[in-house]
Amino acid sequence: MICFILFVFSFLVSVSATAPYKPDDVFLINCGETDVPFDNHGRTWTQEEKNILPKNSDNASFSSVVSYKEESGIPQVPYMTARIFRSDFTYSFPVSPGWKFLRLYFYPTSYKSGFDAVNSFVSVTVNDFTLLQNFSADLTVKASIPESKSLIKEFIVPVYLTLNLTFRPSNNSLAFVNGIEIVSMPDRFYSKGGFDDLITNVGSLIDFEIDNSTASETVHRLNVGGHMVDEVNDSGMFRRWLSDDYEFLIGGVSPYMPDVNISYTEKTPAYVAPAYVYSTCRMMGNAQDTYLNLNFNLTWLFTVDAGFSYLVRLHFFEKYLNKANQRVFSIFLGNQMAREEMDVIRLSGGPRIPIYLDFRIYVGSESGPRPDLRLDLHPLVKDNPEYYEAILNGVEILKLNNSGNLAIIQDNELKPNPPLSSNLTPNHVTQQIKGKSSHLLVKIFIAVGPGTGLATFVVVLMLWMRQMKRKNRKEERVVMFKKLLNMYTYAELKKITKSFSYIIGKGGFGTVYGGNLSNGRKVAVKVLKDLKGSAEDFINEVASMSQTSHVNIVSLLGFCFEGSKRAIVYEFLENGSLDQFMSRNKSLTQDVTTLYGIALGIARGLEYLHYGCKTRIVHFDIKPQNILLDGNLCPKVSDFGLAKLCEKRESVLSLMDTRGTIGYIAPEVFSRMYGRVSHKSDVYSFGMLVIDMIGARSKEIVETVDSAASSTYFPDWIYKDLEDGEQTWIFGDEITKEEKEIAKKMIVVGLWCIQPCPSDRPSMNRVVEMMEGSLDALEIPPKPSMHISTEVITESSSLSDGGEDV
């Protein structure tokens, strides 16, 4: 029976892996009037039907044909006719939910209507995404390498039900387009990761995630070592793979590999890349003495736009080698290590099995607006491979949207797209079965019967294998941490804490114990509970804390990762957490200068996390329990279990779950109606923390006098006190004028920080400036309210920095 199941399973995998992709949606629109339906490849193009045109199409546009055909190589379809726009013009395409290829065809020349594309500039949007801004097709083709007279711009956009494509001519200009192509793609084709379902985040220890609100632009797609692969020879998505013979390559040889037998798999189906791509490659050469290859790299240079993140997909295939450790090399992107050990045979499981890996890298503007993204392959010698060689078959590079904008970096925050589908995705299923034993596979098969049971068995088995792979990836990260930090055994922690006898704190995460190292230094040891998700929290905390070094950030001294035992060792802080301090020291909590010093230190710590680290760290759980105080009442931010790492230029984050603590969690984290989640979420939590520090004692008094106050939104009556100028009594009758101004300044800063719309909140840079500056320089903020309208989200007040750095 088991053999039969495995046979059928392998048959299903084989069929699905080798089957070509058939897109659900295909639109080929030849814009303007034409009687020629077929292009050079035999594909059928249609004219613009009324159902996709706007009602004002006659007034907003007109059609025209080229004055004369300048180049014999320019195809008749779709380049000889064009739709020319006088004003904003929106096509509406009914499509199924999911990501779509959008290809725009341009032939910048003169047209019989008198229109000359030389003077044409246009901005293009799809739903909430800006794809092009003040774009000139004429200037683009003149700067193209290799030289070309026509142009195709390819984008990948997520769409719910309707793809609204808008062309907006620039001032005193007309706009045009010759052809529009829309093609669907397999679910999460560019968002789930490579064959291993991972996107390696170059320069970070945390894998990158692409959510359903991310658009991209294809900037390079290469058939490495071979000729161009045109649309009809792709694997069903009509992609064009260019040769890498131009400025992309430095060094290497391109061997001829005839009659290649490619064994596609479920991990790398046939639609990932056509056989033409895996049939060609570039290698380093020097076959007689590969030791010479240690003197140089196999290198490509790709011109890209600065200020964006890029998804780099690399395709690999080994035909002639058949054992692991024959060819092992390292991959570098942007002069950073992307993968230390790349052994195609070891990863794929055998010869003639294609695989592909995904990497994400941010390209800054240090080298100008159009820098080169460098890709290097170099032999790895430490494992003593049989050949000192490297190989590459294909490259795809996608520019990822920056807060909804693929054209330029802008500050305004955009509304999120609706979800792609209400159906469960494989990720949802993984969450449901996480932590279950393998007996679940047998139970499901028996429960639903042999027919549907086999299909369910296959799906669950694949998901279980994916989960095991992610578990192995976490263990690989721990090995990396061992090189940077002290790693303690559980027995050593038991000795340090004297059998965990001294408890200094408890929480939902676990218990914190006091202890002493062998040199006498006091430490705190946080032992995590053995709960679902705690491994991910542990990885987050170690990864975040290992990158920090600041007086207002708790110092990580080491960790333990032993089976199910996980613990973090950090410096011991004598005064415990801020909430413990405030409950123990009522007299000190009335000292305005003490509270101000603590608040300013916390602000500086958050400023460092957002702007001082190489990789921005968003904490997501700022609250009194996570602020520790040393003997001098110097505050230190701690507990990074919910933290998220991202590049500093990324103003918008992707969250798969709600994270934070009620009372301090930013509204956009649990409801997208308030805006997009970003580092501004920490700003909100800081504001609530400051107001809590200033108003905690006042809140107790008010609730004693008026029980109805407990049901009032806390900042409401704080704001009323600020308006009435009666906040003195919070600290008693003996408060000085200077202390009164400090208290008022803290309240004003706190109220600015808790504005419901993230774009209205100051950055932590600005918060520190406000805290250190004078009260007179501060404006009174609008009254925060959780009941906001759409207009509030789209507007910004005088302290807004648009969701980005100031």
Swiss-Prot record:
Main location: membrane
Cytoplasmic side: 465-806
Catalytic site: D621
Keyword Signal: yes
Domain Protein kinase, residue spans: 498-775
InterPro entries in the record: Kinase-like_dom_sf, LRK10/LRL21-25-like, Malectin-like_Carb-bd_dom, Prot_kinase_dom, Protein_kinase_ATP_BS, Ser-Thr/Tyr_kinase_cat_dom, Ser/Thr_kinase_AS
Domain of life: Eukaryota
Molecular functions per Gene Ontology: ATP binding; protein serine/threonine kinase activity
Disulfide partners: none
Extracellular side: 18-443
Membrane-topology annotation of the record: Single-pass type I membrane protein
Signal sequence range: 1-17
Stored Gene3D superfamilies: Galactose-binding lectin (2.60.120.430), Phosphorylase Kinase, domain 1 (3.30.200.20), Transferase(Phosphotransferase) domain 1 (1.10.510.10)
Coiled-coil residue windows: none
Family designation: Belongs to the protein kinase superfamily. Ser/Thr protein kinase family.
Entry protein name: Probable receptor-like protein kinase At5g39030
Lineage: Eukaryota, Viridiplantae, Streptophyta, Embryophyta, Tracheophyta
